[in-house]
């Protein structure tokens, strides 16, 4: 089952295709993927065809099995979407 952000929690697409949260940064406090840890942001990525959450400091496994590393809040490289995997 996919992890989905609350309706209306993200707004205004950034140039990278991600969805921004509140003005001035990404939203905090959501849970990520299969890991019960706090998210750095609750944003959506259209590159893989479904919303994903991104963790602040640890990799997580997305719905399609890719590992995605959240490096910096608001500056995410969707490595899984490009065939890269972090461990």
UniProtKB/Swiss-Prot annotation:
This is Transcriptional regulator PINT87aa. InterPro entries: LINC-PINT (IPR054147). Encoded by the circular form of the long non-coding RNA LINC-PINT. Enhances the binding of the PAF1 complex to target gene promoters and plays a role in negative regulation of transcription. May function as an anchor to keep the PAF1 complex on target gene promoters, sequentially pausing RNA polymerase II-induced mRNA elongation. Inhibits FOXM1-mediated transcription of PHB2. GO terms for biological process: negative regulation of transcription by RNA polymerase II. Interacts with PAF1 complex member PAF1. Interacts with transcription factor FOXM1. It is found in: Nucleus. GO terms for cellular component: nucleus. Its main location: nucleus.
């Amino acid at each position: 089952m996919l992890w989905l952000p609350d309706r209306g929690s993200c707004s205004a697409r950034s140039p990278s295709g991600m969805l921004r949260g509140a003005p001035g940064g990404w939203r905090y406090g959501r849970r990520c993927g299969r890991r019960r840890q706090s998210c750095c942001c609750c944003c959506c990525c259209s590159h893989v065809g479904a919303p994903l959450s991104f963790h602040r400091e640890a990799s997580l496994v997305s719905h399609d099995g890719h590992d995605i590393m959240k490096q910096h809040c608001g500056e995410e490289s969707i490595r899984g979407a490009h065939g890269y995997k972090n461990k």
